[in-house]
């Protein structure tokens, strides 16, 4: 093994904050740093990193160690793998012990697979520039906006025919069996033949697999072919481009998610080095956990604006919202992907597009509404209930509450209704809830007419009210047929008996329950009965005069008729002074 002196030299050279900050989001707290522990689920940070002591400790689960131990525990590295990674990072030479001189330490399977992938990557890069048949792949990359510097930066390559690949690997002492273990073959055939190769790296830059894109329309298979699952290639956890974007993501707590590897690399190369893509499979909860470890709070979804892209945005957005991340959906113009949009509009155009992103809930409602052939009240109710069920899983109660309020605003329904649907009150026994019936709207004319009739009906021995009503009005002045019928009956009774009609006899005249309720249910101030009666008479007289004037115009040939009506109205107002005798404190004529 390596000498103790060289290992001590490595330990003293390691900056533990630098190492751990590439994997978790650290926040300074005095002389130490704290974070949510990556080894157990927690919301309050209990994971403390001590730079002076070069160690970490979690007060929640008890995890403890140095940078070497962190890589072993967090990434599953062996001790040898961890020290080799760190020695490369901090440029420290590890010295073999004398007895091991000329002896290569035994390699584990993971290290062997990384070595095979590294050799294959080097060969693929060579093929892209030197094989005649690769010129079409190179032209395709240039056409997509990849410069030679970009191609070199991301180690892009070309997959040759199977026979040439096997020959090259054999020269490097790599057997076909080892290539099968590393995931280069499916059903005995080389997976990446005649395709552009995108190497996939882990967080520390090791080549752990490949994604191969076809560039000729007549090529067989899907657009992308990926390395199958291997001991070092776990698609459910790998975020393509993370080795280039990790630092900025952890620093700014935001990430841009795209669908394809080419899109991801073009985004990073254009300055958006907080971009990643899911590797070959659908975006999963494991991917979300990887982002959570970096402290991501804001997620921008930059997917193709087709049906598949929108469905992916709905699913991925919900996963991120559930992890208490704020999700925004950026809508690309139809027919564009991030790569083509950058080529046409440039970085400034994409920045402007990102600034116009919709929040996830607005996008969700818009997509769901458009999925209905017809969107009516029933569909609206179903959509609100579906959205509520989804929102209730989005993190803390406060976040859920705020999203429910936003839902109410988007769907134009009362907030209290949405909140009650989300949190129904459960009682021990069912209660009879009174159902409020819709109260028919009552016309003001009916109210005025029933006010006059109420005064007449409840005037008792005050026959002056009956006399005044008889003097000023006739049954035809009442518009409602029931009011007209009752007024005629009461005046007829008064003229015959010189007294008020008994209440029960008056009720028998009515067949409309609404009029009877207006006469009996509404409160009547009997002490101000005379005033109420006079005011109601005045309203009735004004209505009658307006109706008489309505058909008239200002034409000269009818001017005399209009003046005649006006004289009648003035006389009518003068005649009201008779009513004021009933109430000395009231002056009806100004």
From Swiss-Prot:
Binding-site residues, Mg(2+) 1: 259, 304
UniProt key word Zinc-finger: yes
This protein's record includes keyword Zinc-finger: yes
Cofactor entry: Zn(2+); Mg(2+)
UniProt keyword terms in alphabetical order: DNA replication, DNA-binding, DNA-directed RNA polymerase, Magnesium, Metal-binding, Nucleotidyltransferase, Primosome, Transcription, Transferase, Zinc, Zinc-finger
SMART domains according to UniProt: TOPRIM (SM00493), ZnF_CHCC (SM00400)
Entry's Gene Ontology BP terms: DNA replication, synthesis of primer
EC number: 2.7.7.101
GO molecular function: DNA binding; DNA-directed RNA polymerase activity; zinc ion binding
Domain Toprim residues, every copy: 253-333
Textual note on the cofactor: Binds 1 zinc ion per monomer. Binds two Mg(2+) per subunit.
Positions bound to Mg(2+) 2: 304, 306
GO cellular component: a single term: primosome complex
Catalytic activity: ssDNA + n NTP = ssDNA/pppN(pN)n-1 hybrid + (n-1) diphosphate
Zinc fingers, CHC2-type class: 37-61
InterPro entries cross-referenced by the UniProt entry: DNA_primase_core_N_sf (IPR037068), DNA_primase_DnaG (IPR006295), DNA_primase_Znf_CHC2 (IPR036977), DnaG_bac (IPR030846), DNAG_N (IPR013264), DnaG_primase (IPR050219), TOPRIM_DnaG_bac (IPR034151), TOPRIM_dom (IPR006171)
Family: Belongs to the DnaG primase family.
Subunit structure: Monomer. Interacts with DnaB.
Domain notes: Contains an N-terminal zinc-binding domain, a central core domain that contains the primase activity, and a C-terminal DnaB-binding domain.
Role noted for this protein: RNA polymerase that catalyzes the synthesis of short RNA molecules used as primers for DNA polymerase during DNA replication.
Protein name, UniProt field: DNA primase
């Amino acid at each position: 093994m390596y000498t103790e002196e060289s290992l001590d030299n490595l330990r003293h050279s390691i900056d533990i904050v630098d190492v751990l900050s590439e994997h978790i989001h650290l926040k300074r707290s005095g002389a130490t740093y704290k974070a949510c522990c990556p080894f157990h689920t927690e919301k309050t940070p209990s994971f403390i990193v001590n730079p002076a002591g070069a160690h970490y400790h979690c007060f929640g689960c008890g995890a403890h160690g140095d940078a070497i131990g962190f890589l072993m525990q967090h990434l599953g590295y062996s001790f040898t793998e961890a020290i080799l990674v760190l020695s490369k990072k901090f440029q420290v030479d590890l010295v073999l012990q004398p007895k091991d001189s000329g002896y290569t330490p035994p390699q584990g399977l993971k290290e062997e697979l990384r070595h095979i992938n590294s050799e294959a990557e080097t060969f693929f890069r060579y093929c892209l520039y030197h094989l005649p048949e690769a010129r079409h792949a190179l032209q395709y990359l240039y056409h997509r906006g990849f410069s030679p510097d970009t191609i070199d930066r991301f180690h892009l390559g070309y997959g040759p025919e199977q026979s040439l690949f096997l020959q090259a690997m054999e020269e490097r002492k790599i057997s076909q069996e080892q290539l099968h273990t590393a995931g280069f073959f499916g059903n005995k055939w080389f997976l990446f033949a005649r395709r552009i190769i995108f190497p996939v790296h882990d967080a520390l830059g090791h080549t752990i697999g490949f994604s191969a894109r076809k560039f000729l329309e007549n090529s067989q298979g899907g657009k992308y072919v990926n390395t199958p699952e291997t001991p070092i290639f776990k698609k459910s956890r790998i975020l393509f481009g993370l080795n280039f974007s990790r630092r900025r993501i952890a620093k700014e707590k935001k990430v841009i998610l795209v669908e394809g590897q080419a899109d991801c690399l073009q985004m990073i190369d254009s300055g958006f080095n907080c971009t990643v893509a899911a590797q070959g499979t659908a975006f999963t909860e494991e991917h979300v956990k990887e982002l959570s470890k970096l402290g991501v709070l804001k997620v921008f979804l930059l997917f193709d604006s087709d049906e598949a892209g929108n469905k992916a945005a709905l699913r991925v957005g919900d996963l991120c919202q559930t992890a208490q991340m704020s999700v925004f959906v950026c809508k690309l113009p139809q027919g564009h992907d991030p790569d083509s949009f950058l080529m046409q509009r440039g970085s400034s155009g994409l920045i402007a597009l990102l600034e116009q992103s919709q929040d996830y809930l607005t996008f969700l409602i818009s997509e769901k509404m458009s999925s209905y052939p017809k969107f009516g009240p029933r569909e609206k109710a179903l959509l609100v209930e579906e959205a509520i069920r989804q929102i209730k899983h989005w993190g803390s109660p406060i976040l859920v509450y705020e999203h429910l309020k936003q839902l109410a605003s988007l769907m134009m329904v009362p907030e209290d209704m949405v909140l009650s649907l989300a949190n129904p009150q459960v009682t021990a026994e069912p209660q009879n809830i009174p159902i409020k019936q819709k109260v028919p709207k009552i016309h003001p004319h009916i109210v005025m007419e029933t006010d006059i009739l109420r005064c007449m009906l409840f005037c008792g021995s005050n026959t002056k009210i009956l006399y005044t009503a008889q003097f000023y009005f006739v049954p035809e002045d009442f518009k409602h047929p029931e009011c007209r019928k009752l007024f005629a009956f009461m005046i007829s009774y008064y003229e015959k008996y010189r007294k008020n009609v008994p209440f029960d006899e008056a009720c028998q005249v009515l067949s409309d329950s609404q009029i009877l309720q207006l006469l009996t249910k509404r409160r009547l101030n009997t002490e101000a009965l005379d005033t109420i009666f006079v005011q109601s008479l005045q309203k009735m007289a004004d209505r009658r005069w307006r109706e008489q004037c309505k058909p008239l115009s200002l034409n000269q040939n009818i001017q005399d008729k209009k003046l005649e009506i006006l004289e009648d109205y003035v006389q009518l107002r003068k005649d009201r002074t008779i009513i004021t005798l009933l109430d000395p404190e009231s002056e009806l004529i100004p």
